[in-house]
Amino acid sequence: MAASTNRLRFLYSSARTVPQTGSITPISRRTYATTEPSPSATGAPATARKRTNFTDKLNAGPSFADFVSGGEDNTPLEPSEAYALKTAMVGPAGRKKEMTRLPSWLKTPIPDSKNYQRLKKDLRGLNLHTVCEEARCPNISDCWGGSDKSAATATIMLMGDTCTRGCRFCSVKTNRRPPPLDPHEPENTAEAISRWSLGYVVLTSVDRDDLADGGARHFAETVIKIKQKKPSMLVECLTGDYLGDLEMVKLVARSGLDVYAHNVETVEALTPFVRDRRATFQQSLRVLEAAKQARPDLITKTSLMLGFGETEEQLWDALRQLRSVGVDVVTFGQYMRPTKRHMPVHEYVTPDQFELWRQRALDMGFLYCASGPLVRSSYKAGEAFIENVLKKRRAAGTAGESVTDSKAAVDEATR
């Protein structure tokens, strides 16, 4: 035991007497990698190493002092710089071409929240479709990603996921002969909506020109089922033009809904190039006018996409015509190309321009206008305002027909 102790003492004393060489430095304290200059071994005052290239700057990174003091890297951008579009060369060697990158104000997070997954599961379980998914809406993570279902907004797409028309901006599937209607869809839709404890819901549909009534009776039946399950529910219907059959428009308008929406999509001059040839700007105006005539208290709504190459005068003309048929609400959003098969984007409109057109629409007498790069016709920002207007009207006793009266109107129209 004594021998072992003496041996340990010898090794310890030997280690302490190892001569220091130029390649070995005694460690007096624990060190960490920082962005601050470290003191030299000789004790001479340290100087910050000059950043010579991008790699040095990236490796060093900003210190806390850099953030506090601001500096040239934190100087706010001018609007012209912030809204400047950037380009990139893409493609294989020898065949590269210049493409405009998506502006920063159009980028949205990938949907992955628990509420998004739960909402999606409910829809799949009842064999329902949403325009949020079919049209690849950029707001899906925002509208579906609320902390609870009451904060979520989903636009239910009726009559299947296949359209009989082929608009050049739309990513929904097309076919001349889509599958037949699901007779259980109105009941399933009402059931799904009743589960979510929503106060406001949007119903839309594909165009079904293969049906004699364009699906108007199916639409009306869905509204009636929803109102029967929850009379307090506010319902917005975004419909097609029913090939100009105004009786079908009036049928849906009298079904008990609260907001009748039909989108003109673009200005009149560009309509033949943007929409299916069976749709015209004047026909859409007649649809909106017929809905208002069927129920004067009904809020009517439409939407336009910007970025197709429209001019200011064309937009002014579109707004004047919409006001002339009593449209109450208009929305503006940026056209975003779904695939290479669709129309290219002519222009990315800046947020400042969207705000300008919002003010112009309000000055013209529209009840409400939602305008922004990511705004879509059923975006929840507009619905919150419309919901408050409808509740005030209902409290004042001017909300329109009851569910019973609406059912009678539908029965009469469908004889």
UniProtKB/Swiss-Prot annotation:
The enzyme's E.C. designation: 2.8.1.8
Transferase among keywords: yes
Residue stretches spanning the membrane: none
Cofactor annotation: [4Fe-4S] cluster
Catalytic reaction annotation: [[Fe-S] cluster scaffold protein carrying a second [4Fe-4S](2+) cluster] + N(6)-octanoyl-L-lysyl-[protein] + 2 oxidized [2Fe-2S]-[ferredoxin] + 2 S-adenosyl-L-methionine + 4 H(+) = [[Fe-S] cluster scaffold protein] + N(6)-[(R)-dihydrolipoyl]-L-lysyl-[protein] + 4 Fe(3+) + 2 hydrogen sulfide + 2 5'-deoxyadenosine + 2 L-methionine + 2 reduced [2Fe-2S]-[ferredoxin]
Keywords tagged on the record: 4Fe-4S, Iron, Iron-sulfur, Metal-binding, Mitochondrion, S-adenosyl-L-methionine, Transferase, Transit peptide
Cofactor: binding details: Binds 2 [4Fe-4S] clusters per subunit. One cluster is coordinated with 3 cysteines and an exchangeable S-adenosyl-L-methionine.
Protein name: Lipoyl synthase, mitochondrial
